[in-house]
Amino acid sequence: NITFDTGSSAIQGGFTSVLDSVVMVAKEFDKTLMQINGYTDSTGSFQTNQSLSEQRAGSVARYFMNQGIPASRIRSTGYGPRDPIADNSTASGRSQNRRVEIEMLPMQQ
C-alpha cells in the first residue's frame, strides 16, 4: 500500500522506489491491467473523501503513465472511506487507511 498525508493526494518521496518496482513488473508482464484503488480515512465529509480518494488513485495512475505504462492498461477508482484496513478512531489507524492499493490483473482478451 502507498499511504498519504492527511488531505493530500501527493505521492510521498519515500514511495517512489516502491512504485518504480511496480513499473518494472508491469513492463515485464505487459499483458496485465493495473487496477489502482484509492481510499481515505473517515475524517471529513463523504463527498470530500470520495473526491480525495479519486485524486490519490489518479496521482498513482499518472505516475505510472509518466513511467511509460500505457493508459489503456490502467484503471483507477476511488472508494473514499469505505473498506478501512485499520481503526479510524486512532491516528495510526487513520494513517493506514489513507492509502492506494495496486492490483495487477490479467487483461481480458
Question: What are these model-derived regions, one by one?
Answer:
Residues 1-3:
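Acidic/histidine-rich, surface-exposed loop or edge segments in extracytoplasmic proteins
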